[in-house]
Structure formats: C-alpha cells, structure tokens
From Swiss-Prot:
The encoding gene: MPSS3
Keyword Metal-binding: no
Mitochondrion among keywords: yes
Disruption phenotype: RNAi-mediated knockdown at the procyclic stage causes moderate growth defect without affecting the production of guided RNAs (gRNA).
Subunit description: Component of the mitochondrial 3' processome (MPsome) complex composed at least of terminal uridylyltransferase KRET1/TUT1, 3'-5' exonuclease DSS1, MPSS1, MPSS2 and MPSS3. Within the complex, interacts with KRET1.
Subcellular location: Mitochondrion
Gene Ontology terms: biological process: mitochondrial mRNA modification
Function: As part of the mitochondrial 3' processome (MPsome), involved in the maturation of guided RNA (gRNA) precursors.
GO CC terms in record: mitochondrion; protein-containing complex
Protein name per its UniProtKB record: Mitochondrial 3' processome subunit 3
CDD domains per the UniProt record, alphabetical: MPSS3 (cd23671)
Keywords: Mitochondrion, Transit peptide
Length: 1136
C-alpha cells in the first residue's frame, strides 16, 4: 500500500510537458466565459459571443482560413467545448421561459448555462497508475482545480468571507486560513479548507489514516501544485496559497484573467448601481452597459500593469463590445428579474471511486479492523470501532451502510456478539489473529453486494424522512440565528429571519414564508416578542415582516441550560433533562406520520453547539445512553432513532412543560466513591515498595506535569473545566477523584476556593470549587508535613533512595530545599545507613477542662497583681509575680479543687497543679529558684506585655502565618491538626523545642499564640474568641492575619492586581483603588474573555474605571512608540 501511495504522489506531481494544453486553451476559455457564481446563469448566446469576442483576435488557423471561416470554426469549437464541459459535470444548461434581466425581448435563446455547484471527480485505482498513464490523472486534477479550487478562491474575493466552506475539525496544527473572517484573508486558502470542499459525508482530517482522506488530500495537493506550476496560484511558507500576483497577466486562459480583472475593477461599480435600482425596464440594461463601457474605456486609457493583455490590443469599438458582453455574462446575470442579488453559492466536489479503488479501500478497512483486534483481543465495542475506522466516510464510498453487516460477511475473521446490550466485535473462531483478510474475500463480498443491488432496486429514503431532515435542518439554522442575536441583545424581526433562512428570494415568497412559519411553530422555536407592549400579535395567525420575534419558552430554557453547563454550574444529567430531552420530544411530536425517524447525531450536535460546550461526540453518546430515553441509538451510523407511536395509556408531555415530580438523580459516578485518602490507605496496606514508588511517581506527574500548567492563572480554573482539559478519568482508579486530590494538597501545591456563584448554600457542590496554583512560601516543615509524612509511613524504616526516586527529589525539590537527608533532619527525623528511621509518635490529647482551669487561674492572678494585692518583680524579659506552689494552689477555685484536685495531702495537689501549669503554659508559668534558698521552688507568673522568647516569634511567623488566609477564619484546633503540634510532630524539631522550651506536644498551642499576641507591639496574627461565655479554648478561638502588618500570599497576589477580598455577608472581590498595569492584568487574567458566570457577584453598574497613560512623552506617536518598546505603561483603577 505504501508503494502504491508513493507512486500516486509521483504521478500527481505536475509537469508542463504532460499537461493537456488543449483542455486549457479550449475548454477552460469556454468555462470562464460563464459567471463565477454557481447560482448565476447567463444565456448561451451571450457566453458564446463573449467567447468569440475574446478569441476572435487570436485565430487558431492564422493565414490558412479567412475571418468568416474562422468565426464558424470558433462557434463550432465553443459548442464542442461546452458539450465536453457538460460531460465532465463542470457546466449545466437549462431551458427556461423566463429570461434574465439582461435579455432584450424578442430574441430566441438556446437556454441558460451556469457552472455546476457540485463537481464529480472520478478516481481510479491507485495501484494501476503508471508514469505513462498521465493523461487521465491530469484531466482529473484540472477538473478539480478549475471546477472547485480556483472558483472558490475567486468566489471569496468577489463575495468576501461572509460564507465559509463546511470546514471539518482538524488535528492540532496551523490555523485554517479558509475559516478566518478577517477581511485581510479573503484571498487566502489553506490545504485543509480545500479538502473540506470535497463533499462526502464523514470526511475528517483528524482521521489521517483513512484512505479516503488521503486520496482527497493527495488530489488537492496535486491540483494546487499544478496551479502553482502554471502561475495560477502562489503557495506561501505558512501553507496558505493565494492567487498569483501575475494571474491577471496570463495569456491562457484569457477569460480567467479578464474575469478576475472585471470583478475587481468594473463589477463593483455596476453592482452598486443595480442594487440601488428598483425598475425593471429593458432600457436600464443598456444604461448599465453604458456605465460599464465608460469604466472599461477609462481603465484602458489609464493603462497600468494590472490591465490584462487582451485589452491592450483591442480597438475602441472592440472594447465597447467587450464591456457589453461581459456585463451581460458576469454582472447582470447575478441578479434576478427584479434586480435582486442572487444568494452566493460556493462550489463543492464529490469523489467517485472506481471498482479497483473500492476494492483497495475495503481491503485496507478490513485489515485495519484486524489490526485493532490484535491490540484488544478481548473485543472492541462497535461504536468505538466505527470511530476508529471512520466508518461513516468509508460507507459512503464503499457502498455499505452497516458495519455490523459488513463484518458478518467474514465469519472466519470476525465475530459480533452482544455483551450486556452492546455489540462487541471479536476475533473469529476459524482463523488466528495473524491471518489477514485477503483481496479475493473482499472482492467476493463487494461483488455479492453489487449483484444484489442489480437484482433488487435500492430502497430510497421515505418522503417523510426526507421532509423531517429538511425541517430539522431549517430548525437548527433558525435557532442558531436567533441565539446569535440573543447573545448580542439585538432585536430581530420575522422578515430578517426569513431573509437569513431563505436567501434566494429574500423571504418575499409568501408560500415559502408560510411554510417556514409552519415548521418553526410545529417545532416550538418562535414566540412573539411582546416586550414592547405589542401584545396583540398572535403568532398562530401569521406574522408580518416587521413583527418582532424571539426564542420560544422551550428554546429559551434550553439556551439557559446550555450556558449553565458551559459555565460548569450544571451537570450532564441536568443538561439532558432541561435541553436535550425536550428537544427530542418536540421532534417526535412534530413528525407528520406515525412510525420512526432518524435524527443524525451531527444534527443534535449542531443544535447543542457542542464546539461552545467543549462536548465530544463520545461524551454526548454517553449522556444519551445513560439517560435511556424513548429512543434507540444506532452506534454504527451515529443516529438517534425516534418513534412517534405511543402505547396505550401513555401521554406525551408537552415539550415546554416541567415534570410533576423531579426525576430521580443519576447514580453516583465511580470517581465520587474513590477518594485520594482511600487510595493512599490501599497502597500503604499492601506494604510493597514497588507499588508505593509507582503511586508517588504518579502523584508528582499529576501535580507538576498535568494540573499545574492549567491552573497558573490567578483567577483559577473551575474543577469541571479542569476535568475536561486534563482528562482525569485515567487517574481516578489510581489517585481518586480530582476534587479529593486537589483538596489533599491544598496549601502546598494548590489553592482551592469556593465559587461565589454558589449563593452561600450549606451543601457545597464539588463543581463550584475553583483551583489555582499555590503561590505562598513553602517551608521545609510544610513540605514534610503535607507531602513526605503523608506518602511514606513514619512507623517503619524506609530507604532514602526510594523516597528520593519517587519524589524526583534532585530535579523537583533539591534546588529549593537542598539534599533530602538534611531536610529530614531539620524536621526531627533520624537518618542512618541510607535509611529513614521510624519514629515513635507520642500523642498527648488536649484536655479542655485542665486548660480552662489554668486560664482562669492565670486571669485571677493577673487581676490581683493589677490591683496591687500582689508584689511585682522585674527582670530582663518584663514583669512577673513570684508564688509558691501552695500560694498558687490557694488561688484555685474551691469547686475546681473538689472535682479535679481532691488529694488528701494539700502539698501533693499544689505540686501537681504547678507542674501541669509549667508544662502546659510554659510562657505564662515558669519555675524559679532563689539563689539564697535553693530548697524552695517558686512559680513565676508572667504579666502582660513581657518580651516573649525568640523561638515563639520565629515559630509563629515562619510556620503559623503561611497557613492563614485573610478571608478564611481558622480555628486553633485546625492549625493544631495541620501542624501536627499535639501529635508530636514538633517534639524533635528544633523550631518546636525553641518555641515551647520543653516538649511541644505537651504545650498548649493556644497559650503559645496568645503569648505572642499579647507581648508583641504589632503582632502579625489576631485571636478572635467566638463565644465570650466560654474560655478561649482551641475550638472557640479563630486565628486571622493582621492585615495592617501582615499580608498572606493570596492577598498579596490580589493586591498586585488592584483587588481585595471583602467579607461583608458574602465573600466578594472588590477594587482597592490602587493603579495597576493593564498589560500585567491582561497577561495574568487568561479568562477575561469568557462571559461572567450566572450568579457571580460583580461590581455595581455605578463603578467607574479610570485609565491613565504613563509615558514620558506628550505626543501620541511617541507614546505609542514607548508602549511598543515596553518603556511606557497604561494604568487602570476603579472608583467603586
């Protein structure tokens, strides 16, 4: 097969010596005498006269025959050329009673002739092509070139880019220039846009392995190369090609250059005049011919390089005659009898394969199926196999409709079985996986199908199916037009809708207009727009052209559901119930006859506008399959089969009515039952180092290579949109659901926030979460606590090499944190002989009752000291009060003494109380021994505003502050859990020992934070008790950053963008009135172009944005130069 394709490439390489010049000089001259628009038709006599006019000055047999004989030969040549063009399918002729407006009454006409809108190209067997068999190949390329490619490029120049070809999805690569709507790209085309003009169903450039696509691409490439060698086209380095700059100077074909020059220089002048005229007198044709004559004579006298060569040698009378003929053929033929512009029509092409080519394609198809089964010996679903082999396109050329029926013709190779309601293709029982389908078997299969087709006539589609397809296509076009106007908030009238859907007669035909209205009413598309008080309109009684219309209630609800699904606030099940199901129900109710009809999946995708929803065909099929609606899905041909007959007692619900009871929720997905914590536990229970290594490597790959590149925008990415971008489905089994994964590393790698559009609902939905990259400082302890200690168990010895290899430590973390053993030692872990030694974790539960007793005791002592009932002492760190153990015990309330300190010996209770106070609150109660009396031990009670130890300040500012957020209130219990303070995580940590002065796990974190706040002049944190009636325990004290002194990394990032977070009832992002750079704002906010999500709290309409140009120069030209050189800036700020 590769040899045959290489041979085809060599054959299609153009050569000037092999091109059929007779076809160019004769048939193409007659072809380009016709108008370029496929809808425009001119009289046979006018085209013949123009042909003779342009070729009469260049006799074919100069010096042999006289002028009259030459004219007769030219007439015969024109008729022969037109006949040959008709046989090739490039030209079609019709005999009509109505003549175009350019015809003078009383003349006998042989009919009208026009270009064919669809050109058929015959493709023979690629294997039989030989270097000597080049004539047929050249004729095929020339037919494709001058019948489709060049006319379409010419068509774009004449009619602009308002109409684009039916482009198909492309694989990633350069942009398709043919799909652009930039006026500067009107005369540019891309190779793929020309391949899209090859009309067959299912052609897609993403299926580049499909032989049909390769055939089409090879033909287009050969045609473009042929045009490039003949200086008709010019191919650029970016893959686009344009008309050659010297195309209007070509000597052959003459009429091609003349028509190109005419449509550029003369045609627009006549068209503006015709469009302004409303008369139909025959005299007007002569008037516009006179306008064209003057314009042509003016351009001929002016001369210039763009003037075609034939006009340079014409006399004045010949120029006038040429202007008259060209006006009749090329300009006025594009208007109807009422001087209304005909709708533009673009050429297209169909490929017709020979029997040898069909055999080659079918053989390659079966071999592809065989190769796919080798990769998946357990079987392939028929829908997946249909997409793999591109069956819709292959069936159109091979002539078979059902892939299942085609495979059942080869029972020795394939076996189609039903597995749980799905058709699955498996290997046959008589042959092995290595046995390929032979060409003889495929030939017998095709021959049998061909003979059956000869014996019994083909069953054509029923009239009801054809009518249904035409009506639904009209419905989709109408909905797309009305949605576009709805998004632009532009009112639309019924006349405008008719003009868009009926371009040929501009909606003026009452019969077509009534038919259109009937269709749109049956499919529940239109509703009268009564917003302006025009409530008297009854849409059932008919509409006038000036009546305002809008989308119906059903379509309006469907549009809202589509936009909600696109903005990640609706699930797939809600999309089905609110949009898809009502539409299919409406289609089923609009059927004229009982029975079944087929809705192509492509039609449903057009109605859904899946390109805006980022919804793939496979995902849409999964939605339809899971819903189990009143239809049947044909997975081979990607159709939805609807039925109109109802069972006895069944009542069809109207399309726009809501069900009486809400439908049952869909079963929870597998990903919602799998969490990241469950997957960690599963891996650690196996106690296998290889699985642990693979698990950790997968985590790092998902974090750094998969998720972080997509969440770098400061505004974050919604979870649903992130799921579509990274295709998380393949990681669910290993790492759990995406939501649980990003929440597991919240504050280390990611920042997970709740979307403000959730309206403060108590039950949080995972789809309302927004994920962004964590931009705060990451300390060694934070990395250890949130990553290493979670993935690697601390109760067993683990090789350091395993940890370093799993984490890719040398490439990902070593540049910031140094070597791994040093970091582990800094966090209190011991390393020896290449092993991370296990640690015995000491857990000391927090006793709220003891803490409440100590806080009450401290408050009573400080109150007595404030009233000067106790003697104060001063030291280096501040003021304090010295009490003996007995005196300290005396300040304890009596009820507490009886419940907690009920020891019979008073000294023993006092000793226990003092010991607990010193250990639990070491920075408020300290041991003190007098130098004069070493036998007596005192307790030193610290008074407020005493200087705290250095370790307390370092611990709070380095470990506590990075965990805080301005808009999020964090309790001390939550901080304790994150830091692992009470679980002994800081017991062997140097920072913990310096901060606590003893064992950190036995020390109250609340006491440490309170000591820091009361002793610092400007503390970076604030403690807010929630309930004043209770003691300030762990669960009742909130910790927040002091915004006057400290700014969290998240708030700092918002400040850089001129924003702040307000907690006035609901979390809102507000401006700070600080000027920020417009360029930095645009570069960071990647999602600014997206519309606001429904329900998102935004600024009031009264907010005013100020703009200031920050440049040194006063001249606008100099300012623009500074902006280009990045020396100037534009500052924006808001006065809310």
């Amino acid at each position: 097969m590769k040899k045959a394709w290489a041979q085809l490439e060599r054959v299609l390489q153009p050569s000037s010596s092999r091109v059929n010049r007779a076809l160019i000089t004769q048939q193409l001259e007659a072809l380009y005498a016709l108008p370029i628009n496929c809808e425009a038709a001119c009289r046979w006599e006018d085209a013949q006269r123009l042909f003779l006019r342009c070729n009469g000055h260049r006799p074919y047999y100069a010096g042999i025959m006289d002028q009259s004989t030459d004219n007769r030969l030219a007439v015969a040549s024109f008729e022969e050329n037109m006949l040959a063009l008709q046989q090739r399918g490039l030209v079609c002729t019709t005999v009509g009673d109505k003549a175009p407006p350019c015809v003078v009454g009383g003349q006998t006409s042989r009919g009208l002739c026009r270009r064919s809108s669809i050109v058929c190209v015959n493709v023979g067997s690629c294997a039989d092509l030989d270097l000597n068999m080049h004539e047929d190949c050249d004729e095929t390329l020339l037919t494709l070139l001058h019948g489709v490619v060049v006319p379409y490029l010419h068509f774009r120049i004449v009619y602009g880019t308002g109409v684009s070809p039916p482009l198909v999805p492309r694989a990633p690569g350069p942009a398709i220039c043919g799909a652009s709507h930039d006026l500067s790209l009107q005369n540019e085309l891309h190779m793929d846009s020309c391949v899209a003009l090859l009309h067959p169903r299912g052609l897609c450039s993403s299926n580049c392995n499909n032989k049909a696509y390769r055939t089409a691409a090879t033909l287009v490439r050969g045609a473009v190369s042929l045009a490039t060698s003949d200086t008709l086209l010019h191919q650029r380095q970016d893959g686009c090609f344009t008309l050659h700059p010297d195309a209007m100077k070509l000597g052959s074909p003459r009429l091609f250059a003349l028509q190109l020059w005419w449509n550029k220089e003369v045609g627009p002048v006549i068209q503006r005049g015709v469009e302004q005229s409303v008369k139909t007198d025959e005299v007007l044709s002569g008037a516009w011919i006179e306008v064209a004559r003057k314009r042509v004579e003016e351009l001929v006298e002016r001369g210039g390089d763009d003037l075609p060569q034939p006009l340079r040698n014409m006399t004045r009378d010949d120029v006038a005659a040429f202007a008259a003929d060209a006006t009749l053929c090329w300009t006025l033929s594009a208007f109807d009898c009422n001087y209304k512009r005909l709708g533009p029509a673009q050429p297209a092409c169909r490929l017709q394969f020979s029997e040898e080519a069909r055999l080659s394609m079918a053989l390659e198809l079966m071999q592809t199926v065989k190769a796919s089964l080798v990769k998946q010996p357990t079987g392939i679903p028929i829908s997946e196999l249909s997409a793999t082999v591109c069956w819709p396109a292959a069936s159109a050329w091979i002539g078979e409709k059902s892939l299942t029926e085609a495979l059942t013709q080869f029972p020795a190779h394939f076996n189609v079985v039903n597995v749980e309601g799905k058709l699955v293709v498996m290997h046959g029982h008589l042959t092995g996986p290595s046995d390929n389908v032979t060409a003889e078997e495929v030939s017998e299969w095709l021959a049998a199908g061909h003979s059956e087709g000869l014996q019994k006539p083909c069953v054509a589609a029923s009239p009801s199916d054809l009518t249904f397809h035409r009506e639904t296509d009209l419905v989709v076009r109408a909905v797309a037009f009305l949605r576009k106007r709805h998004f632009g908030n532009v009112p639309v009238t019924y006349g405008e809708l008719c003009g868009a859907l009926l371009p040929k007669n501009n909606g003026k035909n009452d019969g077509d207009s009534d038919t259109l209205l009937n269709v749109l009413l049956r499919y529940d598309v239109l509703a009268a727009d009564t917003a302006k008080g025009d409530s008297s309109i009854n849409i059932q009684c008919g509409l006038r052209d000036g009546d305002a219309i809008r989308l119906s209630v059903r379509e309006d609800r469907a549009l809202r559901a589509l936009e909600a699904f696109r903005t990640t606030s609706r699930s797939a099940f809600q999309l089905y119930t609110e949009a898809i199901e009502p539409f299919l129900t409406c289609c089923r109710g609009a059927m004229r006859e009982n029975g079944s009809c087929v809705v192509p999946l492509t039609l449903l995708e057009r109605w859904l506008q899946v390109e805006r929803l980022s919804l793939q065909s496979k995902e849409l099929l999964d939605i339809l399959r899971s819903a189990e609606g009143p239809y049947r899905i044909d997975e081979e041909l990607c159709n939805v089969v609807l039925t109109n007959h109802t069972a006895k007692g069944e009542v069809l619900t109207p399309a726009f009515s809501l069900p009486a009871t809400p439908p049952p929720p869909p079963p929870p997905a597998v990903s919602s039952r799998l969490t990241f914590e469950a997957q960690i536990s599963r891996v650690l229970k196996t106690q296998r180092p290889d699985r642990l290594l693979h698990f950790v490597q997968t985590i790092l790959h998902a974090v750094f290579d998969l998720i972080l590149p997509h969440v770098s925008a400061p505004s974050g990415v919604p979870v649903r949109m992130l799921m579509r971008r990274i295709r998380w489905g393949s990681f669910v089994v290993t790492l759990g659901s995406l939501t649980s994964f990003v929440e597991a590393f919240d504050g280390l790698f990611f920042e997970v926030l709740s979307n403000a559009s959730s309206h403060g609902e108590e039950k949080r939905d995972d789809v309302d979460l927004i994920v962004s990259a964590y931009k705060g400082p990451v300390s060694p302890w934070l990395l250890y606590a949130r990553l290493i200690v979670r993935l690697f168990p601390a109760d067993v010895d683990i090789p350091l090499g395993l940890i370093a290899e799993a984490l890719s430590w040398s490439s990902r973390f070593a540049p910031m944190f140094g070597d791994l053993p040093s970091l582990l030692r800094r966090v209190g872990r011991q390393c020896r002989n290449g092993q991370l030694l296990a640690k015995v974790e000491m857990v000391r539960p927090v006793c709220d009752q003891d803490d409440a007793c100590l806080w009450e005791l401290l408050a009573k002592i400080r109150r007595e000291a404030h009233l000067h009932h106790l003697e104060r002492s001063s030291g280096e760190t501040g003021q304090y009060v010295l009490l003996s153990e007995t005196e300290l015990y005396a300040y304890l309330p009596n009820d507490v003494k009886g419940e907690r300190w009920n020891s019979t010996v008073k000294e023993e209770g006092a000793r226990c109380l003092a010991t607990m106070a010193v250990h639990r609150l070491p920075h408020f109660f300290e041991w003190h021994v007098d130098n004069t009396d070493t036998t007596t031990r005192y307790v030193r009670v610290v008074l407020p505003f005493s200087t705290p130890p250095t370790g307390v300040v370092c611990f709070v500012e380095e470990y506590v502050c990075p965990l805080l957020r301005q808009h999020k209130q964090t309790t001390i219990a939550e901080l304790d859990e994150q830091l692992g303070w009470s679980h002994g995580a800081f017991d062997a940590h140097p920072a913990g020992s310096q901060a606590a002065g003893g064992t950190p796990s036995a020390t109250s974190l609340c006491g440490l934070l309170r000591r820091y706040v009361e002793s610092m002049h400007s503390p970076k944190i604030i403690l807010e008790p929630q309930e004043t009636t209770l003691s300030p325990l762990h669960h009742h004290v909130h910790v927040m950053p002091n915004s006057a002194v400290y700014t969290s990394p998240e708030d700092m990032l918002l400040l850089l963008n001129g924003l702040r977070i307000s907690n006035e009832g609901i979390t809102r992002v507000l401006p700070t009135h600080k000027p920020v750079s417009l360029f930095e704002l645009i570069s960071q906010q990647l999602d600014l172009h997206q519309p606001f999500r429904e329900g998102l709290t935004t600024l009031e309409r009264g907010s005013r944005w100020n703009v200031m140009l920050a440049c040194e120069s006063d001249s606008m030209d100099d300012c623009l130069q500074e902006l280009d050189n990045c020396t100037g800036d534009i500052l924006v700020w808001c006065e809310g």
